[in-house]
Regions:
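Hydrophobic alpha-helical transmembrane segments
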Residues: 83, 112-164, 186, 221, ...
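Interhelical loop/hinge segments that connect adjacent transmembrane helices in multipass membrane
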Residues: 137-143, 155-202, 211, 216
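Interfacial transmembrane-helix starts/ends
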Residues: 32-47, 55, 78, 184, ...
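Membrane-interface junctions at transmembrane-helix termini in multi-pass inner-membrane proteins
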Residues: 87-114, 127-128, 138, 159, ...
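Interfacial/gating helices of multi-pass transporter permease domains
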Residues: 1-7, 37, 137-142, 178-187, ...
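Helix-loop junctions and terminal segments of transmembrane helices
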Residues: 12-28, 104, 164-168, 231-241
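Alpha-helical transmembrane segments of multi-pass membrane proteins
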Residues: 58, 71-95, 112, 150, ...
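Short membrane-interface helical motifs at transmembrane helix boundaries
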Residues: 53-72
């Protein structure tokens, strides 16, 4: 739950890098540069997502072979949910450039509509988990992955259809070393700050697990992260507006 709660924060942190460059060139009325920076940003986020997949999949065996205190009968389910969280992280990364494009174009209404719909789906998920007699952890992972996929499609499909700056066929043609380095240079500090927060929050969750704390302790910590994520989202929304 803690990892899922932080996905919204990760998205907002990553959007800043792309949105800064897109807004600058929108201000200069240089639509071609907007398209170029969007293409480079998307490819950069795709590479970062691939790198994280390799790292987290490599850690899977170590984490679930005894490092984390997980009941034997729940280990397989937890491992599958872990892979779903990795998939959600990938969707979060590659959706960031699209969301940045909406912010740069000041299309805040569409972002708000998507976020409200996302909240409704999560509310329905919570009610569904209470009603169905299924493995709640597995169902939670599957439904959250579907919700993340719907959110990604809402941003990406609309962008491809409505925005001339978003041209999938030109992504690799627009890639340039200079543009990529500028994005990496700015993204480095953003990623560093984002990584520090992720290590702090999820590190505490792992620490609670290793200290053999009761499940209620981790659950309370997860709820606290949900509140923190909501407050961060409100703050980011005000800044975007």
């Amino acid at each position: 739950a803690g990892v899922v709660a932080m996905l919204g924060f990760v998205t907002n942190a990553m959007v800043i890098t792309t949105q800064r460059h897109l807004s600058f060139y929108y201000g200069k009325k240089d639509v071609q540069k907007v398209r170029i920076y969007f293409s480079n940003s998307f490819l950069l986020h795709l590479c970062m997502a691939f790198f994280l997949v390799v790292v987290f999949v490599s850690l899977r065996g170590f984490l679930f072979s005894g490092y984390l205190e997980i009941a034997e009968e729940r280990r397989e389910i937890a491992s599958w949910v872990y892979m779903m969280v990795i998939a959600m992280l990938v969707l979060t990364f590659i959706s960031a450039p699209f969301k940045a494009l909406f912010i740069a174009k000041e299309n805040i209404w569409y972002i708000t509509a998507v976020d409200v719909f996302d909240g409704i789906l999560k509310f329905v998920l919570a009610i569904t988990l209470l009603q169905l007699n299924v493995d709640k952890l597995l169902m939670y992972g599957v439904m959250m992955l579907i919700i993340m996929l719907v959110q990604f499609l809402a941003y990406s499909v609309y962008s491809v259809i409505r925005f001339s700056e978003c041209q999938p066929t030109r992504i690799f043609k627009d890639v340039g070393k200079t543009y990529m380095l500028q994005l990496v240079n700015f993204a480095g500090w953003t990623t560093y700050g984002m990584g520090a927060v992720m290590v702090r929050t999820q590190g505490l969750s792992v620490l609670f697990n290793k200290m053999l704390c009761e499940t209620a302790v981790n659950a309370a910590y997860g709820i606290g992260l949900q509140v923190y994520s909501a407050v961060s989202f409100i703050s980011s929304s005000v800044q975007n507006a």
